């Protein structure tokens, strides 16, 4: 799914 990669980016943003 396209949301797959997007979810990972969100987690990285929490840095």
Swiss-Prot record:
pH dependence: Optimum pH is 5.2 with ABTS as substrate. Optimum pH is 6.8 with hydroquinone as substrate.
High-level lineage: Eukaryota, Fungi, Dikarya, Basidiomycota, Agaricomycotina
EC number, as in UniProt: 1.10.3.2
Gene Ontology terms, MF aspect: hydroquinone:oxygen oxidoreductase activity; metal ion binding
Entry function: Lignin degradation and detoxification of lignin-derived products. Active against a variety of substrates including the benzenediols hydroquinone and catechol, the benzenetriol pyrogallol, the methoxy-substituted phenol 2-methylcatechol, the aromatic diamine N,N-dimethyl-1,4-phenylenediamine and the nonphenolic heterocyclic compound ABTS. Shows highest degradative activity towards hydroquinone with lower activity against ABTS and N,N-dimethyl-1,4-phenylenediamine. Activity towards pyrogallol, catechol and 2-methyl-catechol is considerably attenuated. Shows no activity against tyrosine.
Compartments, record wording: Secreted
Keywords for the protein's UniProt record, in alphabetical order: Copper, Lignin degradation, Metal-binding, Oxidoreductase, Secreted
Family: Belongs to the multicopper oxidase family.
Activity regulation, free text: Activity is enhanced by Al(3+) at concentrations of 1.25-2.5 mM. Activity is reduced in the presence of Cu(2+), Hg(2+), Pb(2+), Fe(3+) and EDTA at concentrations of 1.25-5.0 mM. Activity is not significantly affected by the presence of cations such as K(+), Ca(2+), Mg(2+), Mn(2+) or Zn(2+) at concentrations of 1.25-5.0 mM.
Thermal behavior of activity: Optimum temperature is 30 degrees Celsius. Activity declines sharply as the temperature is increased from 40 to 80 degrees Celsius and is abolished at 80 degrees Celsius.
UniProt cofactor note: Binds 4 Cu cations per monomer. Copper is inhibitory at concentrations of 1.25-5.0 mM.
Signal sequence bounds: none
GO BP term, example: lignin catabolic process
Other facts noted in the record for this chain: Displays antiproliferative activity against a number of human tumor cell lines and inhibitory activity against HIV-1 reverse transcriptase.
Catalysed reaction equations from the record: 4 hydroquinone + O2 = 4 benzosemiquinone + 2 H2O
Record-given protein name: Laccase
Cellular component terms (Gene Ontology): extracellular region
Cofactor: Cu cation
């Amino acid at each position: 799914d396209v949301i797959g990669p997007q979810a990972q980016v969100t987690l990285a943003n929490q840095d």
